[in-house]
A protein has these predicted regions:
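Extended recognition/assembly regions associated with phosphoester-bond processing machinery
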Residues: 1-154
Length: 154
């Protein structure tokens, strides 16, 4: 069975989301900023998806609940002991806004820690390794590639 967990993204989710195969979150309204041949920058809503560092995420959940890890302790083992279930390896999917009136955060031009919510503010997700897709499903590339392209490095 494929398990999906969803949460808004503005606050810490329940640790049980880590048992899902996919975690769907919102709150950031991700967009991708593109540079046109005329030098005009435009932004478009985008889906963002990727795999987090599970050990760092497990350690962060424990830290959030005031469980301090000793240097030799494995975060995944302690996570299972503390919460009573095994931490999976979920993919994170960040939903765009579907309302043209609402703005968004250009994930390829914002500093990753300026994104909203604890998973991003605490740098638990390496956004540059995540992929961006337009609303119609068109694959745009990794956020890191899109950042390099916007900054003229590609």
């Amino acid at each position: 069975d494929f398990k999906v967990a969803a949460f808004h993204g503005h606050a810490w989710p329940n640790p049980a989301v880590m048992t899902a195969d996919a975690i769907i979150m919102a709150h950031n309204h991700p967009t991708v900023m593109l540079d046109t041949p005329l030098g005009v920058k435009i932004t478009r809503p985008a889906w963002v998806r990727g795999k987090p560092d599970i050990e760092r995420l497990a350690a962060a959940f424990l830290n959030q609940d005031n469980v301090r890890l000793k240097e030799e302790e494995e975060p995944l083992s302690i996570f299972e002991e503390e919460y009573g279930f095994e931490c999976g390896s979920p993919e994170i999917i960040v939903m765009p806004t579907f309302n043209d009136i609402l703005g968004g955060l250009p994930v390829n031009s914002e500093a990753p820690e300026s994104l909203l919510g604890p998973l991003f503010r605490k740098k638990l997700v390496d956004m540059d390794t995540f992929d961006a897709y337009m609303l119609d499903g068109t694959f745009m590339g990794s956020i890191g590639f899109l950042r390099d392209r916007l900054e003229g490095r590609v």
